[in-house]
Amino acid sequence: MNIVDTKINSGFWKERKELNKSVSLYAVLKSFEDTGRIKALTGDNDPVKQRPHIFWESDLAKLMEGAFFSMQQEKDEKLEKICDSIIDKIIANQEEDGYLNYFFSKHEPDNKFTNLRDRHELYCAGHLLESAVEHHKATGNSKFFDAMERYVDHIISKFGKEEGKMRGYPGHQEIELALVKAYEHTNKKKFLDLATYFIDERGTHDKPEDHYYVKEKKKLMEKEGEID
């Protein structure tokens, strides 16, 4: 059932819904401003007191997804304007090839997709994609979703069973859910195909040494000079 097909007209849950819209979303937004999560997108955060983290982007995406759910039931121009500003800051970091992760683009450009198990790149991509789907539903504006579709196309070019691609999968599952939602939203099979690949590829090797994360760790240790 779509969220716009449901209405809560009275009682406890109506009160909670109104509290979420008028208080909770803005309280979380204030926390994100204070901790530098939004400023980090443009590099204006304090690098010591507001040291960037690999999954700050996903925090913003989850906040906005909640806002977009609320906006699908009741328009909110103030909230839409705030989210629109954050979206612009996020997609301004998109690279020419479609890659979109401010942390790695700004701080570790040589480490993209080198530690899928621990570094949350695909996890962040998933939350951004989920948020973009709900943004499109709430506003009709496709700029966020268009940017995320470009990122998905980039991910498709990097991962898969085809020769030259990485046979990896996310350490923290999340993008699979987002890809299915994107497929349901657009009916574009590429989203479903990528989700299916990530799900089916996980845990397919009988020998521990054949698992992607084991091979990935070996490459990282070689890069850092821990092994020859």
Q: What residue spans do the PLM features occupy?
A:
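Glycan-recognition and catalytic cores of secretory/periplasmic carbohydrate-active enzymes
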Residues: M1-D228
